[in-house]
């Protein structure tokens, strides 16, 4: 589902990150992934897809970045999945700096303060593929280095995508 940008004052990466963390903290179960609950917790208007089973919102942050917040059914299951992501819409090599004011460490600290337990899921060469956070709902958090400008920026983990079930 592609969501048309909302016509309002653009949110910053930090603004939308704080709203998503507030939303995650409010979820008691997968049943809370409803239009009404997301609108109440994020302050954003959701749009329903033509099929009626999916909904979401999204908007530009700047000329290179946008965010998407989408909910849809999990195939073969009676539950929904929320996907939040920062999407490069301009320069495909743009640094994540505009969407990394709250970095992975900030997200992880906030999620742990909410009672979530974390574990890294590793891929080949012991590289972290994503982070699992278990609580009232299950999260997968995918990260990316802030930029290729320096070893420090490469190692600085920014949140790229979060899925919630």
Which positions does each model-derived feature cover?
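Sequence contexts marking disulfide-bonded cysteines in secreted/extracellular proteins
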Residues: 1, 99-101, 157-159
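N-terminal leader/targeting segments
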Residues: 1-77
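Mature, folded catalytic cores of secreted/periplasmic enzymes
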Residues: 14-27, 62-63, 108-112, 135-148
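A structural detector for beta-sheet-dominated domains
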Residues: 36, 41, 45-47, 70-72, ...
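Generic recognition of long tandem-repeat/solenoid scaffolds
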Residues: 52-61, 84, 128-133
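Long, charged/polar, surface-exposed segments that mediate recognition or autoinhibition
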Residues: 65-130
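Glycine-rich, aromatic-bearing surface loops/beta-hairpins
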Residues: 126-165
